[in-house]
Structure formats: C-alpha cells, structure tokens
Amino acid sequence: MDQGSSSCCRIDHRMDFQQGLISTIHDYGLGNLDLAEFRRQLKHCPTALLIPCLMEEFSRPALGLIREVLSDLSGLHELVIALAADSSDDVAAAETFFRGMPFPVRVHWTNGPAVRELLESMRGLGLDVTGPAGKGWAVWQGLGVACREAEVIGLFDADIRTFSPAYPERMLRPLLDPSHGVAYVKAYYSRLSLETQALQGRATRLFVGPLLTALAQIFGPVPYLRYLQAFRYPLAGEFAFRRDLAMNLRIPCDWGLEIGLLSEVYRHVALSRIAQVDLGLFDHKHKALGNQPSEGLQKMAGEILGTVLRGLMEHEGRSLASEQIPTLEVLYRRVGEDHVRQFGLDAAINRLPYNRHNEELAVQSFATLLRPGVQGLMTTPVAHQLPSWSRLLSCTHGLQSDLVTAGARPTRSTPTLHQRPSLRHRGGSAPRPQPQPAAPISPVVQ
C-alpha cells in the first residue's frame, strides 16, 4: 500500500474526536511520540509490564519484535513473563531470550511443580487457586508477582505482530501522571490482517457488539450495558491499571476474561477514572470460527455470553426469562446482519477484501449459541473466578513472596534475575544493550 492509500485508510480514524461515557484518548496521526520523556516518567513511578506467554510464542516473530521495542524502555521497573512451560530447560531458554534488557526481567513459571504445590496448599484455607490453566490463571499469577513493587502495571499479549513504541507509551502515560486521575486504561484499535488487509476481530464485530445492542433493546439503557457499549473494543487484551485497583480485582478463568475484568473495574472504579486509548492498526494471531460450539470463536463467544449475562445479574439484578430467549435470538440476528452489511460497505470504500458470505455464516453460528448459553447460565449462574490478591493476602501475608520464589527456575548455579549485575555504569548511563537470541529454542527468533 502506498503512502497516499495508507492515509486514506486512516483518515476516518484520525479525525475522530468524539467523547462518550468514558474518556477516549484518540490517535490523531501526528506522531507526537517522546520516548525520552516517557522514560523519565517511568523512572519516577515504578512500572511493570506483564506478558502472559506460551513456549510456542518464542518460535514466532511477534515476541522478537516485542523484545526489540521494549529494549528501548530503560526506565521500566520490571518485565514479568508469566510463562506456561513443560520444563525448567524451557524457562532457562526464555530467560536467555530476554537477557540483556535494560531492566530486570522475571520469567515466572506458572505451571511449574513448585507453583502447583504452593497453590494446592491454599486448599487448606478453603481457597481454590489451582487453575484452570490459561490466560486468566497466568494473568492472576503475574499480577501477584508484578504488584509487589510496581505502582502501575500494563499487560500485553505475546502475539502482537504490530507492536510499536507507541503501544506502551500511550497505554501507560495516562496512569503515570496522577493529575489525570486515571486508574484503568484499556486499548482499542483497528483489527486488520497484515497479509490481506481484511477486517479481523469477528468476536467483537459480529458477536459482542450485536449482543449488547440486542440486550439493550430488551432491558433498556441500563447503566452496566451502557458502560460496556462505551468501549470501542471490549475484547481487547491490552490494558493497564494502578496497583491498588489490580490488587482488588477477581480474575475470570475462561474466554470471558476481558469482559469479566471490565465488570470488575465497573464494580470498583468511578467512570471518570476509566479511559480507553487508540493504538491504531493492530494484528495478532487469528482464531478460527470452529465447527462446533466447543471450538474456536464459538467456544469463546459462548463463554463471553455467560460473562455478560452474569454481569447483568450482579450489577443490575436483571436476568433473561425463558420467554425472552426467542426475542434475544431474533434481535441478535437482525443486528448482526445489519453489522455485516455495514462492515461490507466500510470494507468496500476502503478497498479492503470482505467475504460477506463467511461473515453471515459467523452470525448464524453465534446465534445458535444463545439459547443453550442462557439455559446453561440458569443451571450454573456462578462462574469460577480467582480471588483478588487483597483477599488472599488478608489470610496469608507471605503468598506473594512465596509465589515469586516458587515461580523461579530451580537452580543453584544461575543467579536470580534481581541478583544480576547492574546494567548501568558508574560513570553514567550504559549504552543500549542488544538483546541476545534464545539459542536453546528452535527456531530462534532473530
């Protein structure tokens, strides 16, 4: 795409200056990125980045790009990699991959034997924190580790293919200046495939958006639904918060994680302290629709549906009656089909490829999930959530420190990350270090 066509694709986006129920930080396309000032802000406010990660991500280019971008953030207090790995050798390889960064990097082995033993011991206190394994469990552990010292914590996925210095800068700056009064920041973006430039984000575009519109027609403009609708990309997995908020959030353990966290934020924070920030064009791994409700985007949508409806119960005392299920099905299909037509127009004028038939099939598949999803919720209205860290520390004060110890790679010969020699020379700042490739991992991300 040449420069002219790129500007064309972005003009709508850059000229948007509308505000809504929550503060919106737009990208006006001016490129006003000041990394030197951002580094100074980081040094004055202990800030950690948390990246939940599977070992398979180390063989993909995205994580190498993230490492390269972050290697320029010398003021960062800590990078926490919440890693699911099969062996201590994998953990060692991950440590090698991130060696040479200008800040401490802690690779936390989320499913290591010591962590499992520690969390299993919590059953004696009546607490089930042993899983299920997944992003929610990794985020929960990573927050426990990161919140020991950091005042601000930002979370990014490990598969972002468009990661740039603007991502952490725009996500964290609203929280680094206390005068803004912001406690929580969530990303939004335009999901486009790097290869084909096709619209992505079907779960958000074709399920969550139409679902919230349909529910608002059934229940009216109740505050909780208006709140969810205020987010331009409610399923964004990139967000940041102040430590006091992070410590008080329960963490969902399924595909409802992002909506569930929004529900928790709604519970704890005034709307005036919530913001969303535009990260521009964004691409990461894509998930297939799936051939049945237990697969792919269909499984994700089913769990998101349950999370949205539980939020209505919790915050509004409202639930769908059996006789309202057909209404929801009809409304969702109508709104979903309207969205397909609208996205088709959007794609056509922006000269983006668009398969309307496949989009219609996705809406049909999502619609079939509504009835069993609502009925299942009536049978099991309470979902498993991991307790907040403030709740845990009220009954076992040393759990955070114990978790850090348990999550470290078991070895006596290699110093822990916080014992490594300082990266700063006595005479001044060290030159920017070059991250080293992870030799034990094949293929190596260069």
Model-derived segments and spans:
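Short beta-strand/loop segment that forms part of the nucleotide-sugar
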Residues: G75-S87, R106-G112
